[in-house]
Regions:
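Transmembrane helix-bundle core of multi-pass membrane transporters
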Residues: 156-225
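Short, Lys/Arg-enriched N-terminal segments with co-localized hydrophobic residues
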Residues: 1-20
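Hydrophobic alpha-helical transmembrane segments
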Residues: 38-45, 68, 75-76, 97-101, ...
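Hydrophobic core segments of alpha-helical transmembrane domains in multi-pass membrane transport
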Residues: 40-53, 82-83, 135-138, 167-169, ...
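Single transmembrane alpha-helix segments in multi-pass membrane proteins
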Residues: 48-52, 61-112, 140, 147-154
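Alpha-helical transmembrane segments within multi-pass membrane transporters and channels
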Residues: 114-163
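Short cytoplasmic-facing helical segments at TM-TM junctions of multi-pass membrane proteins
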Residues: 227-233
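Membrane-interfacial amphipathic/re-entrant helices at transmembrane-helix boundaries
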Residues: 17-79, 114-129
Length: 233
């Protein structure tokens, strides 16, 4: 009597080959996930390469990079604040309008001052005082948004949409549709405008330094402090 050997699938008879194939599939999946996570950065690199080829060395010139860094720093600072909101599952549509409002108020304070009609005097303020005042105004608007969402139960989208239009309306009323340009201030008050904030330090825009400091502070808050743990939770 001849016994026929059991027929096994080829993969069962070659476990080493099966493991190799599984490892390759796993590596391919990990590579694909990595590419998907970094797709924004990849697109950015491709755009830089494309415009470098099209425009030559002028695209990566010092003046161009400085201009880009100045604008990116502004949006980066806004993004840091939005990060905390988005992590908690919220959204804030009013952030751009709030920036426009406080910018308009700051321009008015530094160029025109605040006129007290009942006393017949006009008060002018130094740049540090104006900056602190605008930060307080921004915090108050943010607190109002938070109270509307948490205490009144209004959806963040609706609450911040309303705040966006209110801030935009106040900015238009304050400026009558005009802009504040050539903001020089008054030397006697040490108030020469926002030249320092708009200037460069060691060839790098001041806003980039501010953004870097705020980014480090944000990371420390999220990773090291109980408030950050609560936000991430």
């Amino acid at each position: 009597v001849h016994l026929m050997p059991d027929l096994e699938p080829e993969e069962m008879r070659k476990p080493g080959r099966s493991r190799t194939m599984n490892n390759k599939k796993s590596n391919n999946n990990q590579l694909l996930m990595t590419l998907l996570k970094g797709r924004t950065f990849i697109v950015l690199v491709l755009l830089v390469i494309f415009f470098t080829i099209v425009k030559g060395t002028t695209f990566l010139s010092a003046s161009t990079l400085t201009m880009v860094a100045k604008h990116v720093a502004l949006y980066g600072i806004l993004a840091l604040g939005m990060t905390f909101v988005i992590i908690t599952g919220g959204i804030d549509l009013s952030v751009g309008s709030v920036v426009g409002l406080v910018g308009m108020l700051a321009g008015g304070m530094i160029q025109e001052g605040i006129t007290l009609k009942f006393a017949g005097v006009t008060l002018y303020f130094s740049v540090p005082v104006i900056i602190i005042t605008m930060l307080v105004v921004g915090c108050i608007i943010g607190a109002v948004n938070g109270l509307i969402v948490t205490k009144l139960g209004v959806a963040p989208f609706i609450a911040t949409l309303g705040t966006m239009y209110i801030c935009r309306g106040f900015a238009n009323l304050r400026s009558n549709g005009a802009t504040f340009s050539d903001i020089k201030g008054y030397d006697g008050l040490g108030n020469t405008g926002f030249k320092i904030l708009g200037s460069n330090i060691a060839g790098i825009p001041t806003g980039v330094y501010i953004f870097a400091v705020l980014a480090v502070i944000s990371v420390i808050i999220l990773k090291k402090l109980p408030f950050g743990w609560y936000v991430l939770a």
